Design a protein with these regions (language model features):
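Active-site capping/gating regions of soluble enzymes
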Residues: 2-13, 75, 88, 105-122, ...
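Short hydrophobic alpha-helical runs that function as membrane-insertion/retention elements
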Residues: 29-30, 61, 91-94, 225-231
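Conserved, mostly hydrophobic/aromatic
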Residues: 19, 65, 128, 219
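Active-site beta->alpha loop and helix N-cap motifs at the rims of alpha/beta catalytic domains
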Residues: 34-120
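N-terminal capping/small domains of soluble enzymes
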Residues: 1-45
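Generic enzyme active-site microenvironment
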Residues: 63, 93, 127-130, 203
Length: 329
């Protein structure tokens, strides 16, 4: 199998369609979070795990992003979600860190989950570890974590693990569309050495807003194997509607009210008084793209929206591919 160097969040149907088309010529993965697509539905196109998988087919590699307890829309143990993931996804990111107090606790939960899921589907691949925003760890801690997994899992089970998440300093500010993480190249080097020592591939999360400054390429030059990018692609669509609605004061106000009332900005914005109406829309518009109110009141005013949006998304995918194509996994 040719493993993708970049994985894209399915922020909307337009993003999914563009990734599928891109996947006809290039290796790429889709990384639905549980809030986007889950066994019980999600905010992206009303897809559930099965219908999403059936729509995408085998055009791209499907990876559950942040699978597990407390990762869905409502608090749960993640079991039902994992059971469906086993049937339809190629790769599952096992991430119990949100429910873990220590890295040992996370390791024990990871082991338990992998043991259970490998029985249900022996062809499943796994990604382990998590991003800095959820649980920060050092290279030495990742060494301990992976060593513990290798000792407690069977050889076959451990061999199903393909990726370990590294933390070189990424953090997103959706309101300003910037990556405000403090990138540390020496830290990345240490993480990559750790991961390679276990014959695994390194993967960085929150790789948004790095392509234009060639910071994605910098990471691959140092040996990074794969990167996740999500909100940035949803914001391409948000930007299109924001630009269009700003030409009509009433339409802009309706878009703002829909976004504000969704409450989805609260995850990303601590003090709403510090951002503009435009920034609030850019922060959370992608969450409401499939809502009936948005479709009727906003999208209906833009008959050629999907075609124009997909053109922008495809251009961004081409640029990402250009910056990563010379690096081999």
């Amino acid at each position: 199998m040719k493993y993708p160097k970049y994985y894209i969040g399915p922020m909307s149907k337009n993003v999914v369609d563009c990734v599928m088309k891109h996947g006809q010529q290039h290796s790429v993965g889709l990384i639905p979070s549980r809030r986007q697509v889950d066994y019980c539905g999600g905010y992206v196109n009303q897809w559930n795990t099965r219908t999403f998988s059936e729509y995408v087919g085998d055009t791209v590699l499907l990876c559950r992003d942040h699978g597990g307890e407390l990762q869905g829309k409502d608090p749960d143990d993640g079991v039902e979600s994992f059971n469906e993931d086993c049937k339809y996804f190629d790769l599952i990111h096992v991430d119990p860190f949100r429910a873990s107090k220590t890295i040992k606790d996370a390791a024990e939960r990871t082991i338990q989950i992998i043991k259970q899921l490998s029985v249900q589907n022996s062809n499943l691949m796994f990604e382990v570890g998590t991003e800095e925003a959820i649980f920060k760890y050092e290279p030495e801690q990742l060494t301990w974590f992976l060593t513990y997994l290798s000792m407690e899992l069977t050889e076959n089970q451990f061999n199903q693990i393909k990726y370990a998440v590294v933390q070189s300093g990424t953090r997103l500010d959706l309101s300003t569309r910037t990556n405000i993480g403090n990138f540390n190249n020496k830290r990345l080097d240490k993480f990559i050495q750790v991961v390679k020592s276990f014959d695994l591939m390194s993967k960085e999360h929150n790789g948004d807003y790095l392509t234009d400054s060639f910071d994605v390429e910098v990471r691959f030059e140092r040996g990074l194997d794969a990167i996740n990018i999500a909100p940035e692609y949803g914001q391409v669509e948000s930007e299109y509607y924001l630009e269009g609605c700003k030409k009509d004061g009433d339409l802009f106000e309706r878009l703002f009210v829909i976004c504000y009332n969704s409450g989805k900005w609260k995850k990303w914005v601590k003090d709403i008084n510090r951002i503009s109406q435009d920034q609030l829309i850019m922060t959370c518009c992608h969450y409401v793209l499939s809502d009936q109110q948005f479709i009727e009141e906003i999208k209906s005013n833009f008959p050629n929206a999907d075609k124009l949006i997909q053109k922008r998304i495809s251009s961004k995918l081409k640029l990402l591919n250009e910056q990563t194509k010379n690096y081999c996994i």
